Amino acid sequence: MSSTKRARNQVRLSRALGLPLTPKAAKYFEKRPYPPGEHGRARRRTESDYAVRLKEKQRLRAQYGIREAQLRRAFDEARREAGLTGEALVELLEMRLDALVLRSGFARTIAQARQAVVHRHVLVDGKIVDRPSFRVKPGQVIQVKPRSQARTPFQVAAAGAHRDVLAQVPEYLDVSLEKLRSELVRRPKRAEVPVTADVQLIVEWYAR
């Protein structure tokens, strides 16, 4: 799939889900904040409870760019933890390596963060990790590989060019952007994680 087609699909998905998933989608979303399609602007019907819960699950999936099976596994793990399942779900997803690469400002989108990991540009505690789903533990250090830091995308990131579209660095990360290095200092708390999701609706979806 070409980058142009991928970007177009992200714009369409953003409009369908009601939230911008990429910086480019955000610009289009400002102009057309309604679902895609011939009758998108005119749609006013009330959604069923089923549709509302399904959409909320899809919104969370899209923000992390993960498959249904991955979200289901994370939910099953969250359900085994103490406390609120929905909050635990987001906290576990946020500790994915690709998510933390994005939050650290080393990439502009979750897709770019995943690509950096898959292409073996990212180290965890000095060792290459090429699995975007890798669970980072508190105290572990994420860094762009020294040989990769000279590449243009990472030079752009180190200069802080993505800060115009990314949320402020959350308190669970200690980031040295110029060194393309960050540390997960503690487990994220749901309230700190910059994703839009009604987690209770997602819990209700899986509890059907």
Swiss-Prot record:
Q: Give the GO molecular function terms.
A: rRNA binding; structural constituent of ribosome
Highest taxon listed in the record's lineage: Bacteria
What the entry lists under InterPro entries is as follows: Ribosomal_uS4 (IPR022801), Ribosomal_uS4_bac-type (IPR005709), Ribosomal_uS4_N (IPR001912), S4_RNA-bd (IPR002942), S4_RNA-bd_sf (IPR036986)
Q: Which PROSITE patterns match?
A: S4
The Gene Ontology biological process terms listed for this entry are: ribosomal small subunit biogenesis; translation
**Residues spanning the signal sequence:** none
Q: Pfam families per the record?
A: Ribosomal_S4, S4
Q: Name one GO cellular component term.
A: small ribosomal subunit
Give all residue intervals belonging to the S4 RNA-binding domain.
95-159
Q: Does the keyword Plastid apply?
A: no
Keyword Transmembrane found: no
For this UniProt record, give its keywords in alphabetical order, as a comma-separated list: Ribonucleoprotein, Ribosomal protein, RNA-binding, rRNA-binding
* Residues covered by region (Disordered): 28-48
Quote the function comment for this protein. One of the primary rRNA binding proteins, it binds directly to 16S rRNA where it nucleates assembly of the body of the 30S subunit.
Checking NCBIfam families in the record gives: PRK05327.1, rpsD_bact
Q: Could you say which protein family the record assigns here?
A: Belongs to the universal ribosomal protein uS4 family.
Subunit and partners: Part of the 30S ribosomal subunit. Contacts protein S5. The interaction surface between S4 and S5 is involved in control of translational fidelity.
- What protein am I looking at? Small ribosomal subunit protein uS4
